[in-house]
């Protein structure tokens, strides 16, 4: 059981470790610069930015370590870049195997197409979980190293609640992967989809009468700034993201089961 999931997870292990180290080091670099901003009027600088930009990246209380981490690490690197990455990786999974004719070999075994999709998704969950286990340790250690303090509970929650968000981005990529047979096209479409959804939420969030449009975006349900700065945990948003993930994975299974591979 779960042979496909184990194989795919092991194949991504080295890349996951490299990504975790890279994000951890980048976070430490950002933190190393924070003390030098002590005398700067960061709040005044932020007020000079357009409201849409402030809304897009959740800029709030940037003069505090919580606000600084929220904007520099979690709003940009974690929410946007990592969301794009997991969607990209998922989109190239099944489409890549189909393009390289590896999927024909997999399906020659006693395994259903639905199981292939589910186990592929399970393997894609491993990097998400690993990153959320490794990176917060580096961030917390970095905060202490520069003489600052941060709520360990809030830091843990910003990572815990990012899991449903990242899984939703993964599911978007997976759904695209079963529709297209060229990995490069699927990956680019997944990146474009997640980025456009990010822009939709960013633009409509501060627009009277149009806020509801942003509810189609995964970023609508995960706000690192609210967690780190205000200690507000959006459990409802996490449930919505998990439900959306389940629907997308189910849809991907159905589409892949009914599709004609290689067409």
Which ranges hold each PLM region?
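Secretory targeting signals
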Residues: 118, 122-170, 174
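Terminal transmembrane helical anchor/hairpin motif
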Residues: 29-67, 189-255, 259-263
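Hydrophobic/aromatic residues in alpha-helical transmembrane segments
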Residues: 83-90, 138, 171-172, 218, ...
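Aromatic- and glycine-rich beta-strand/loop motifs that create alpha-glucan
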Residues: 1-24
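Long, hydrophobic alpha-helical segments
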Residues: 69-93
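Transmembrane helix boundary and interhelical loop/hinge segments in multi-pass membrane proteins
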Residues: 87-107, 121
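A structural motif at transmembrane helix-loop-helix junctions in multipass membrane proteins
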Residues: 160-199, 203
């Amino acid at each position: 059981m779960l042979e496909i999931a184990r194989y795919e997870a092991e194949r991504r292990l080295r890349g996951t470790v490299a990504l975790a180290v890279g994000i951890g080091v980048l976070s430490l670099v950002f933190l190393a610069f924070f003390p030098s901003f002590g005398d700067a009027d960061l709040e005044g600088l932020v007020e000079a930015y357009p409201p849409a930009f402030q809304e897009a990246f959740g800029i709030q209380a940037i003069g505090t370590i919580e606000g600084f981490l929220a904007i520099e690490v979690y709003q940009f690197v974690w929410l946007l870049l990592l969301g794009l990455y997991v969607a990209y990786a998922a989109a190239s999974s099944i489409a890549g195997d189909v393009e390289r004719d590896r999927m024909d070999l997999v399906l020659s075994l006693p395994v259903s197409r639905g199981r292939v999709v589910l186990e592929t998704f399970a393997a894609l969950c491993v990097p998400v979980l690993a990153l959320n286990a490794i990176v917060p340790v580096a961030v917390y250690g970095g905060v202490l190293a520069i003489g600052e303090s941060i709520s360990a509970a809030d830091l843990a929650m910003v990572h815990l609640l990012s899991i449903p968000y990242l899984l939703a981005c993964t599911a978007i990529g997976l759904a695209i992967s079963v529709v297209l047979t060229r990995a490069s096209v699927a990956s680019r479409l997944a990146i474009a989809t997640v980025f456009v959804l990010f822009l939709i939420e960013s633009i409509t969030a501060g627009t009277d009468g149009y806020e509801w449009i942003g509810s189609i975006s995964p970023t609508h349900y995960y706000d690192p700034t609210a967690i780190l700065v205000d200690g507000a945990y959006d459990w409802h948003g996490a449930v919505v993201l998990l439900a959306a993930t389940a629907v997308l994975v189910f849809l991907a299974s159905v589409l892949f089961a009914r599709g004609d591979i290689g067409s």
